Amino acid sequence: MNEQTISRFAIILLALVMAVFGIYHFIYPQNLVGYVPSFLPDLGNLWVYIPGAAFILAAIAFITNKKVKLAAYLLAVLLFIFVLTIHLPNYLNASSDENSQMALINILKDTAIAAFALHIASNSPN
């Protein structure tokens, strides 16, 4: 396999992961609404649906190879916002070792995915 094929496979794999995350946001919003920062206005599940839609739209962009640069940059920004407003506060204010570990895992996961999205954006012609 050449490098371009491997790169395309990696991007499609990320797209599938993001699509699953997005679908999960729509199927199980009640499991995620508790993570919405308290400084945001109370709009119920809307705060869960918006990133879910963003994940699905990023997946579509990656799979169709349209607007990849924009989608990847926006995905990275969204994930860094999650790290700073959700996962880091959860880590710093964790009520148990288990919660602290889960928050740290989420910090690392979202940072890694954001870094990959930045790599995709920086190498995408469109």
Residue ranges and their predicted role:
Residues 9-10, 29-42:
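Short juxtamembrane and helix-loop transition motifs at transmembrane-helix boundaries
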Residues 1-27, 47-53, 57, 63-126:
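Extended, low-polarity transmembrane helix blocks
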